[in-house]
Protein backbone atom coordinates (compact mmCIF):
# COMPACT_ATOMS: atom_id res chain seq x y z
CA UNK A 1 0.00 0.00 0.00
CA UNK A 2 1.40 3.39 -1.02
CA UNK A 3 0.92 6.31 1.36
CA UNK A 4 0.52 9.67 -0.40
CA UNK A 5 1.38 13.06 1.04
CA UNK A 6 -2.30 13.93 1.27
CA UNK A 7 -2.85 10.97 3.62
CA UNK A 8 -0.38 12.31 6.21
CA UNK A 9 -2.22 14.13 8.99
CA UNK A 10 -1.98 17.89 8.53
CA UNK A 11 -2.14 20.09 11.66
CA UNK A 12 -4.39 23.09 12.07
CA UNK A 13 -2.95 26.58 11.93
CA UNK A 14 -0.73 27.43 14.91
CA UNK A 15 -2.24 29.00 18.02
CA UNK A 16 -0.08 31.88 19.24
CA UNK A 17 -0.19 33.26 22.77
CA UNK A 18 1.93 36.32 23.54
CA UNK A 19 3.32 35.90 27.07
CA UNK A 20 5.38 39.11 27.21
CA UNK A 21 6.53 41.71 24.72
CA UNK A 22 9.44 39.49 23.64
CA UNK A 23 8.08 36.03 24.43
CA UNK A 24 5.35 33.88 22.92
CA UNK A 25 3.99 30.35 23.14
CA UNK A 26 3.03 28.58 19.91
CA UNK A 27 0.85 25.46 19.87
CA UNK A 28 0.59 23.20 16.83
CA UNK A 29 -1.80 20.23 16.73
CA UNK A 30 -2.80 17.60 15.85
CA UNK A 31 0.36 15.93 14.62
CA UNK A 32 1.03 12.30 13.82
CA UNK A 33 2.97 10.34 16.41
CA UNK A 34 6.63 11.40 16.31
CA UNK A 35 6.11 14.46 14.12
CA UNK A 36 6.08 16.88 17.07
CA UNK A 37 9.61 15.88 18.10
CA UNK A 38 10.80 15.98 14.49
CA UNK A 39 9.43 19.46 13.84
CA UNK A 40 10.22 20.82 17.30
CA UNK A 41 13.88 19.82 17.23
CA UNK A 42 14.41 21.12 13.68
CA UNK A 43 12.72 24.45 14.38
CA UNK A 44 14.63 24.90 17.64
CA UNK A 45 17.99 24.38 15.92
CA UNK A 46 17.17 26.81 13.11
CA UNK A 47 15.78 29.42 15.50
CA UNK A 48 18.98 29.42 17.55
CA UNK A 49 21.46 29.29 14.68
CA UNK A 50 20.06 30.77 11.49
CA UNK A 51 17.87 33.80 12.21
CA UNK A 52 19.80 36.91 11.10
CA UNK A 53 20.43 39.70 13.56
CA UNK A 54 22.76 42.54 14.49
CA UNK A 55 25.51 42.84 17.07
CA UNK A 56 28.32 45.16 18.16
CA UNK A 57 31.46 43.59 16.69
CA UNK A 58 34.19 46.20 17.20
CA UNK A 59 34.79 48.91 19.81
CA UNK A 60 37.27 51.75 20.17
CA UNK A 61 37.49 53.54 23.54
CA UNK A 62 39.60 56.65 23.95
CA UNK A 63 42.62 55.90 26.12
CA UNK A 64 42.16 52.12 25.96
CA UNK A 65 44.72 49.99 24.14
CA UNK A 66 43.44 46.52 25.05
CA UNK A 67 40.58 44.83 26.88
CA UNK A 68 42.56 44.29 30.09
CA UNK A 69 42.98 48.01 30.71
CA UNK A 70 41.46 49.83 33.69
CA UNK A 71 40.26 53.40 33.29
CA UNK A 72 40.36 55.96 36.09
CA UNK A 73 36.86 57.04 37.03
CA UNK A 74 35.29 53.92 35.51
CA UNK A 75 33.80 51.52 38.06
CA UNK A 76 34.04 48.47 35.79
CA UNK A 77 37.13 47.22 34.03
CA UNK A 78 37.15 47.36 30.24
CA UNK A 79 36.49 43.63 29.88
CA UNK A 80 33.23 44.00 31.82
CA UNK A 81 32.22 46.99 29.69
CA UNK A 82 32.73 44.91 26.55
CA UNK A 83 30.60 42.11 28.00
CA UNK A 84 27.82 44.60 28.69
CA UNK A 85 28.02 45.96 25.14
CA UNK A 86 27.37 42.48 23.77
CA UNK A 87 23.89 42.55 25.31
CA UNK A 88 22.79 45.76 23.61
CA UNK A 89 19.87 44.86 21.31
CA UNK A 90 20.27 46.78 18.04
CA UNK A 91 18.32 46.79 14.80
CA UNK A 92 19.44 48.37 11.50
CA UNK A 93 16.47 49.11 9.26
CA UNK A 94 18.44 49.39 6.01
CA UNK A 95 21.89 47.96 5.30
CA UNK A 96 24.20 45.51 7.01
CA UNK A 97 26.62 47.73 8.92
CA UNK A 98 26.64 50.95 10.91
CA UNK A 99 29.08 52.94 13.03
CA UNK A 100 27.80 54.63 16.18
CA UNK A 101 29.35 56.66 18.97
CA UNK A 102 28.86 57.03 22.71
CA UNK A 103 29.96 60.04 24.75
CA UNK A 104 29.22 60.57 28.44
CA UNK A 105 30.63 63.08 30.90
CA UNK A 106 30.21 63.28 34.65
CA UNK A 107 29.49 60.76 37.38
CA UNK A 108 26.53 58.49 36.77
CA UNK A 109 25.20 55.48 34.92
CA UNK A 110 26.01 54.96 31.24
CA UNK A 111 23.21 53.12 29.42
CA UNK A 112 22.43 52.08 25.87
CA UNK A 113 20.33 55.24 25.57
CA UNK A 114 23.58 57.24 25.58
CA UNK A 115 24.57 55.70 22.24
CA UNK A 116 24.03 58.24 19.47
CA UNK A 117 21.91 56.79 16.67
CA UNK A 118 20.25 58.02 13.49
CA UNK A 119 16.91 57.23 11.85
CA UNK A 120 18.31 53.99 10.40
CA UNK A 121 19.42 52.44 13.70
CA UNK A 122 17.19 51.53 16.63
CA UNK A 123 18.25 50.42 20.11
CA UNK A 124 15.61 48.24 21.74
CA UNK A 125 16.84 47.95 25.34
CA UNK A 126 17.94 51.55 25.85
CA UNK A 127 17.83 51.08 29.63
CA UNK A 128 20.56 48.42 29.51
CA UNK A 129 23.50 49.43 31.73
CA UNK A 130 26.89 49.58 30.03
CA UNK A 131 29.05 51.00 32.84
CA UNK A 132 29.23 53.50 35.73
CA UNK A 133 31.33 56.67 35.95
CA UNK A 134 32.36 57.34 39.57
CA UNK A 135 33.79 60.84 39.16
CA UNK A 136 33.67 63.82 36.86
CA UNK A 137 35.35 62.11 33.94
CA UNK A 138 34.42 61.28 30.36
CA UNK A 139 34.07 58.15 28.28
CA UNK A 140 34.12 58.28 24.50
CA UNK A 141 33.77 55.21 22.30
CA UNK A 142 32.99 54.21 18.72
CA UNK A 143 30.97 51.10 17.98
CA UNK A 144 30.73 49.03 14.81
CA UNK A 145 27.50 47.11 14.25
CA UNK A 146 27.24 44.28 11.73
CA UNK A 147 24.63 41.83 10.50
CA UNK A 148 25.24 38.11 10.87
CA UNK A 149 24.00 34.69 11.97
CA UNK A 150 24.41 32.72 15.17
CA UNK A 151 27.51 33.16 17.33
CA UNK A 152 30.90 34.16 15.98
CA UNK A 153 33.93 34.31 18.28
CA UNK A 154 36.36 37.15 17.67
CA UNK A 155 39.13 34.79 16.57
CA UNK A 156 37.01 33.62 13.62
CA UNK A 157 36.32 37.14 12.40
CA UNK A 158 39.88 38.41 12.57
CA UNK A 159 41.29 39.08 9.11
CA UNK A 160 44.88 38.38 8.03
CA UNK A 161 45.58 42.12 7.94
CA UNK A 162 44.34 42.66 11.51
CA UNK A 163 47.91 42.69 12.82
CA UNK A 164 48.16 46.13 11.25
CA UNK A 165 44.79 47.28 12.56
CA UNK A 166 44.36 50.51 14.47
CA UNK A 167 45.77 50.22 17.97
CA UNK A 168 42.91 50.16 20.43
CA UNK A 169 40.36 48.59 18.09
CA UNK A 170 38.81 45.79 20.15
CA UNK A 171 37.12 42.90 18.35
CA UNK A 172 34.24 41.31 20.24
CA UNK A 173 32.74 37.84 20.27
CA UNK A 174 29.40 38.48 18.56
CA UNK A 175 26.05 36.85 19.23
CA UNK A 176 23.98 37.90 16.22
CA UNK A 177 20.99 35.69 16.94
CA UNK A 178 17.96 37.72 18.06
CA UNK A 179 16.50 34.55 19.60
CA UNK A 180 17.51 34.27 23.24
CA UNK A 181 15.77 31.05 24.24
CA UNK A 182 13.75 28.27 22.62
CA UNK A 183 12.14 25.34 24.41
CA UNK A 184 9.55 22.86 23.22
CA UNK A 185 7.46 20.16 24.83
CA UNK A 186 5.33 17.42 23.32
CA UNK A 187 1.97 16.50 24.80
CA UNK A 188 -0.70 14.02 23.83
CA UNK A 189 -3.47 15.22 21.51
CA UNK A 190 -6.83 13.73 20.60
CA UNK A 191 -9.09 14.03 17.58
CA UNK A 192 -12.45 12.28 18.02
CA UNK A 193 -11.54 8.65 18.75
CA UNK A 194 -7.85 8.95 17.83
CA UNK A 195 -5.58 9.28 20.83
CA UNK A 196 -2.22 8.42 19.25
CA UNK A 197 -1.51 12.03 18.26
CA UNK A 198 0.95 14.73 19.34
CA UNK A 199 0.69 18.38 20.33
CA UNK A 200 3.79 20.58 19.87
CA UNK A 201 4.24 23.55 22.22
CA UNK A 202 7.12 25.93 21.44
CA UNK A 203 8.21 28.67 23.85
CA UNK A 204 10.24 31.40 22.11
CA UNK A 205 11.94 34.44 23.63
CA UNK A 206 13.77 37.11 21.58
CA UNK A 207 15.80 40.21 22.39
CA UNK A 208 13.07 42.46 21.02
CA UNK A 209 14.62 43.22 17.63
CA UNK A 210 12.23 40.68 16.11
CA UNK A 211 9.01 39.29 17.57
CA UNK A 212 8.69 35.60 18.35
CA UNK A 213 6.07 34.96 15.68
CA UNK A 214 8.22 36.46 12.94
CA UNK A 215 11.24 34.47 14.13
CA UNK A 216 9.27 31.23 13.94
CA UNK A 217 7.95 32.11 10.49
CA UNK A 218 11.49 32.83 9.28
CA UNK A 219 12.73 29.50 10.68
CA UNK A 220 9.91 27.66 8.91
CA UNK A 221 10.78 29.42 5.63
CA UNK A 222 14.44 28.40 5.99
CA UNK A 223 13.51 24.76 6.58
CA UNK A 224 11.08 24.81 3.66
CA UNK A 225 13.76 26.22 1.37
CA UNK A 226 16.32 23.62 2.48
CA UNK A 227 13.93 20.69 2.06
CA UNK A 228 12.65 21.90 -1.31
CA UNK A 229 15.81 20.59 -3.01
CA UNK A 230 14.57 17.04 -2.38
CA UNK A 231 11.65 17.74 -4.69
CA UNK A 232 13.99 17.71 -7.69
CA UNK A 233 16.25 14.70 -8.13
CA UNK A 234 17.36 15.57 -11.66
CA UNK A 235 20.89 16.34 -10.40
CA UNK A 236 21.83 12.99 -8.93
CA UNK A 237 25.55 13.32 -9.59
CA UNK A 238 26.79 15.49 -6.73
CA UNK A 239 30.04 16.29 -8.53
CA UNK A 240 28.57 17.50 -11.80
CA UNK A 241 25.65 19.73 -12.63
CA UNK A 242 24.30 18.58 -15.97
CA UNK A 243 22.27 20.96 -18.11
CA UNK A 244 18.61 20.12 -18.64
CA UNK A 245 17.41 19.11 -22.08
CA UNK A 246 16.35 22.71 -22.73
CA UNK A 247 19.82 24.05 -21.87
CA UNK A 248 21.73 25.27 -18.84
CA UNK A 249 19.95 25.65 -15.51
CA UNK A 250 18.64 29.26 -15.56
CA UNK A 251 19.83 29.79 -11.98
CA UNK A 252 23.44 29.43 -13.11
CA UNK A 253 22.96 32.20 -15.69
CA UNK A 254 21.89 34.70 -13.06
CA UNK A 255 24.46 37.39 -12.17
CA UNK A 256 26.20 37.18 -8.82
CA UNK A 257 24.48 40.46 -7.91
CA UNK A 258 21.34 38.36 -7.39
CA UNK A 259 23.07 36.68 -4.44
CA UNK A 260 22.98 40.03 -2.58
CA UNK A 261 26.52 39.66 -1.29
CA UNK A 262 28.25 42.50 0.51
CA UNK A 263 29.81 45.09 -1.78
CA UNK A 264 33.30 43.96 -0.78
CA UNK A 265 32.68 40.32 -1.68
CA UNK A 266 30.91 41.14 -4.96
CA UNK A 267 33.68 43.48 -6.11
CA UNK A 268 36.38 40.91 -5.29
CA UNK A 269 34.58 38.29 -7.42
CA UNK A 270 34.03 40.63 -10.36
CA UNK A 271 37.70 41.60 -10.28
CA UNK A 272 38.44 37.92 -10.98
CA UNK A 273 35.92 37.82 -13.89
CA UNK A 274 33.33 35.94 -11.83
CA UNK A 275 30.07 37.43 -13.11
CA UNK A 276 27.57 34.58 -13.01
CA UNK A 277 26.52 32.07 -10.37
CA UNK A 278 27.75 29.41 -12.80
CA UNK A 279 31.22 31.01 -12.71
CA UNK A 280 31.22 31.09 -8.92
CA UNK A 281 30.20 27.52 -8.06
CA UNK A 282 33.07 26.13 -10.15
CA UNK A 283 35.61 27.76 -7.85
CA UNK A 284 37.00 25.86 -4.86
CA UNK A 285 37.49 27.35 -1.41
CA UNK A 286 41.25 27.39 -1.94
CA UNK A 287 40.88 29.26 -5.23
CA UNK A 288 38.59 31.87 -3.70
CA UNK A 289 40.91 32.46 -0.74
CA UNK A 290 43.65 33.32 -3.24
CA UNK A 291 41.46 36.14 -4.55
CA UNK A 292 42.94 39.52 -3.50
CA UNK A 293 41.09 41.15 -0.55
CA UNK A 294 38.71 38.20 -0.16
CA UNK A 295 39.17 36.67 3.28
CA UNK A 296 37.59 33.89 5.32
CA UNK A 297 34.68 36.09 6.38
CA UNK A 298 33.74 36.75 2.75
CA UNK A 299 34.19 33.06 1.92
CA UNK A 300 31.84 32.09 4.75
CA UNK A 301 29.28 34.58 3.48
CA UNK A 302 29.51 33.16 -0.07
CA UNK A 303 29.11 29.57 1.16
CA UNK A 304 26.08 30.49 3.29
CA UNK A 305 24.35 32.34 0.45
CA UNK A 306 24.97 29.50 -2.00
CA UNK A 307 23.84 26.94 0.58
CA UNK A 308 20.53 28.74 0.98
CA UNK A 309 19.95 28.07 -2.72
CA UNK A 310 21.02 24.44 -2.62
CA UNK A 311 24.35 25.19 -4.30
CA UNK A 312 27.97 24.79 -3.28
CA UNK A 313 31.54 25.37 -4.39
CA UNK A 314 33.84 23.08 -6.35
CA UNK A 315 31.17 21.96 -8.83
CA UNK A 316 32.17 20.88 -12.32
CA UNK A 317 29.96 22.25 -15.09
CA UNK A 318 29.84 20.69 -18.52
CA UNK A 319 30.14 23.02 -21.52
CA UNK A 320 30.50 26.21 -19.53
CA UNK A 321 30.12 28.99 -20.49
CA UNK A 322 27.18 28.18 -22.76
CA UNK A 323 26.74 29.92 -26.12
CA UNK A 324 25.65 33.51 -25.70
CA UNK A 325 27.46 34.06 -22.40
CA UNK A 326 30.59 36.15 -22.73
CA UNK A 327 33.54 36.25 -20.39
CA UNK A 328 32.79 39.89 -19.63
CA UNK A 329 29.59 39.29 -17.73
CA UNK A 330 27.16 40.09 -20.54
CA UNK A 331 24.55 37.98 -22.23
CA UNK A 332 24.62 38.30 -25.96
Curated annotation (Swiss-Prot):
Residues 248-332 are annotated as: Alpha C-terminal domain (alpha-CTD). Pfam families: RNA_pol_A_bac, RNA_pol_A_CTD, RNA_pol_L. Residues 1-234 are annotated as: Alpha N-terminal domain (alpha-NTD). GO terms for biological process: DNA-templated transcription. Gene3D superfamilies: 5' to 3' exonuclease, C-terminal subdomain, DNA-directed RNA polymerase, insert domain, RNA polymerase, RBP11-like subunit. Keywords: DNA-directed RNA polymerase, Nucleotidyltransferase, Transcription, Transferase. InterPro entries: DNA-dir_RNA_pol_insert, DNA-dir_RNA_pol_RpoA/D/Rpb3, DNA-dir_RpoA, RBP11-like, RNAP_asu_C, RNApol_insert_sf. Its EC number is 2.7.7.6. One of its GO terms (molecular function) is DNA binding. GO terms for cellular component: cytoplasm; DNA-directed RNA polymerase complex. It catalyses: RNA(n) + a ribonucleoside 5'-triphosphate = RNA(n+1) + diphosphate. The N-terminal domain is essential for RNAP assembly and basal transcription, whereas the C-terminal domain is involved in interaction with transcriptional regulators and with upstream promoter elements. Belongs to the RNA polymerase alpha chain family. DNA-dependent RNA polymerase catalyzes the transcription of DNA into RNA using the four ribonucleoside triphosphates as substrates. Homodimer. The RNAP catalytic core consists of 2 alpha, 1 beta, 1 beta' and 1 omega subunit. When a sigma factor is associated with the core the holoenzyme is formed, which can initiate transcription. This is DNA-directed RNA polymerase subunit alpha. It comes from Xylella fastidiosa (strain Temecula1 / ATCC 700964). The gene is rpoA.
Amino acid sequence: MTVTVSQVLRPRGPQIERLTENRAKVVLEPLGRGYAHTLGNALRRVLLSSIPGFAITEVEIDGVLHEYTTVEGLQEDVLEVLLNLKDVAIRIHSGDTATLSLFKQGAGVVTAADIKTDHNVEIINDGHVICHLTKDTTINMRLKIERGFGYQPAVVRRRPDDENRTIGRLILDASFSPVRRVAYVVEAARVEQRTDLDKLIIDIETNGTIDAEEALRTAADILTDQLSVFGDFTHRDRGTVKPASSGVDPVLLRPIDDLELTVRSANCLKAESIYYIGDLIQKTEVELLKTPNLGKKSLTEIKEVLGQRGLGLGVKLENWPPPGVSQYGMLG
